[in-house]
C-alpha cells in the first residue's frame, strides 16, 4: 500500500483514537486506499464496508485481495440485506418488506468492529433504515467511518439525500451502539486529475478552491460564456483552431444534446 498523505494520515489518527469519523472527500482522493491502508496497518481490526453498487464493491475486494488484506468484508446494501434478511431477491421492495416485518437475521451476524459506509451522499431513507436495523440487530458497540462527497450525489431521482453525509453526526449519534464522539475530516488532494484540470473545475464549476491535484498536465483553455450564444462561440473556436493548424479530425465536440434546438452543433 502507498504511504498516506497528510489528509489520509489525519483520518487514520482519528480512527486510532476511537472516534467515529465523517469524511467529505472529493473525487480521486483515495478513499479506498485510506480504508485498505487502515485495514493493512490494523490487521486485527475486523472491518465491514458497505457501498452503493456492485462495481464499487468489486473494486474494494480486488484491491484487498491484491494487497493480501483479509480483515475486511465488503457488501452493497442489497448483498448485506440478502445475506441476513432476504430469502429471495435483491430488490428495494424486498428490503422494505423485511423492514416492515422486522425480520430477524437468518444467521449470526459476522463479527466486525468498524463499519465503513461509502458514497453516503447516495444513501436513501430505505438504506438508512436497513443499516439502523442491522446495527441494532448486531447489538455490540462499533466504530463508524462515513465517506462521501456532497457534490457527487447522482441518485436524487431514487430518493438519495446528501444530508446523510452533511448531517451525519446528528443522524447517527442517537444509535446506542455508537458511543464515541464524531469528528469530521476532509480530503481535497485528488490523484485522478491534473493541476490545470483542478483549476478549471474549481473556478468554473465549483466557484471555490475545493480540489487540489498533485499531477502536472498540459494547460486547459476554456471559455465561460452565456449558453444562449453557444453556437457562435463554438463556431469561432473551431475556426480559430483550424486557422492555427489543427485538422477537423483533431476536434471533438461534446454536447448535452445534438437534437432539437442544438442541431446547429451538427452543422
Which role fits each region the language model picked out?
Residues 43, 66-68, 108:
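Short hydrophobic "helix-edge" motifs at membrane interfaces and signal-peptide entry regions
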Amino acid at each position: 500500500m502507498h504511504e498516506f498523505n497528510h489528509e489520509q494520515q489525519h483520518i487514520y489518527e482519528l480512527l486510532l483514537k476511537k472516534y467515529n469519523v465523517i469524511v467529505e472527500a472529493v473525487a480521486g482522493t483515495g478513499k479506498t486506499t485510506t480504508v485498505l491502508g487502515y485495514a493493512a496497518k490494523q490487521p486485527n481490526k475486523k472491518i465491514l464496508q458497505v457501498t452503493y453498487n456492485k462495481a464499487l464493491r468489486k473494486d474494494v475486494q480486488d484491491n484487498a485481495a491484491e494487497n493480501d488484506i483479509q480483515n475486511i468484508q465488503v457488501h452493497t446494501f442489497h448483498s448485506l440485506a440478502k445475506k441476513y434478511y432476504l430469502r429471495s431477491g435483491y430488490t428495494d421492495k424486498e428490503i422494505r418488506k423485511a423492514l416492515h416485518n422486522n425480520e430477524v437475521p437468518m444467521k449470526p451476524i459476522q463479527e466486525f468492529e468498524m463499519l465503513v459506509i461509502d458514497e453516503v451522499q447516495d444513501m436513501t431513507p430505505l438504506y438508512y433504515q436497513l443499516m439502523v436495523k442491522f446495527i441494532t440487530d448486531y447489538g455490540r458497540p462499533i466504530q463508524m467511518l462515513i465517506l462521501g462527497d456532497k457534490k457527487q450525489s447522482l441518485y436524487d431521482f431514487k430518493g438519495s439525500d446528501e444530508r446523510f453525509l452533511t448531517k451525519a453526526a446528528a443522524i447517527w449519534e442517537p444509535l446506542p451502539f455508537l458511543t464515541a464522539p464524531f469528528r469530521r475530516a476532509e480530503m481535497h488532494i485528488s490523484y485522478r486529475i491534473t493541476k490545470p484540470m483542478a483549476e478549471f473545475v474549481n473556478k468554473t464549476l465549483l466557484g471555490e478552491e475545493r480540489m487540489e491535484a498533485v499531477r502536472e498536465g498540459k494547460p486547459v483553455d476554456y471559455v465561460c460564456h452565456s449558453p444562449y450564444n453557444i453556437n457562435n462561440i463554438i463556431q469561432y473556436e473551431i475556426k480559430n483552431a483550424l486557422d492555427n493548424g489543427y485538422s477537423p479530425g483533431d476536434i471533438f465536440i461534446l454536447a448535452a444534446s445534438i437534437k432539437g434546438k442544438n442541431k446547429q452543433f451538427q452543422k
